[in-house]
Amino acid sequence: MPVSSIIRQWNYIEKITACDATGHQHYQDFNDVRSLFYNGVEWTTGYPAATGIGTQWGGIMIDVDALLCKDGSVRVLGVDNPLQIAAHAYSQNVLLGEKDAALPQKTTPKFERAKAVWKEDHGFVYVSGTAAIRGEQSLEGVGIEQQTLTTLENIEYLVSRDNLNRSGIPAMENATLITFRVYVKRWEDMEKAKQVVTERYPDLPAIYTLTDVCRSELLIEIEGMGILC
């Protein structure tokens, strides 16, 4: 299958926000390599939905979902969120670490905020790893509760009918969220994060894991799946 058939990607990066002795950040190094790899591919439906998340060890591990529909009956489109600048359009101001000497500048994270897949009047949407970012700036100094709430609000607008329609997806109503995976940076914030998510989505299955996220100031990241109808 071609690389462009990837619709969802999970990137597990050891010590994601750490920098090596030369000042190169692990996540930025990954983004530079991903950009070089993706440059040889035509992404006609947008980049994959993706999550970039930290691990304590293991180098880099990547998992993907891919789709190849030869008869054209299934449609795929990337979904932007007007509340957030597309990650692949970030400015240099929010890209950390030293620039790779082989590149003219640091490259951006190549993923879409979500990826919709549908056939006729039904389908699903992959929600990329989402955090408390508005525009391209993190919401800092507000604590885990507010960051969690802002993250959920970002997801809710992302999968809203108005936003899906704006992106060219013929949704009749908001996508129905069916599952979350919640990444929490600090153990002491775990129960507070669970409380905010559960109060808003008491019946939604959610997996919580303790791990680092892609910016040092961000305390939580949430990804999910939704049903289109």
Model region roles, listed by residue range:
Residues M1-I13, T17-E153, Y157, R161-C229:
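N-terminal presequence-like segments and the immediate start of the first folded domain
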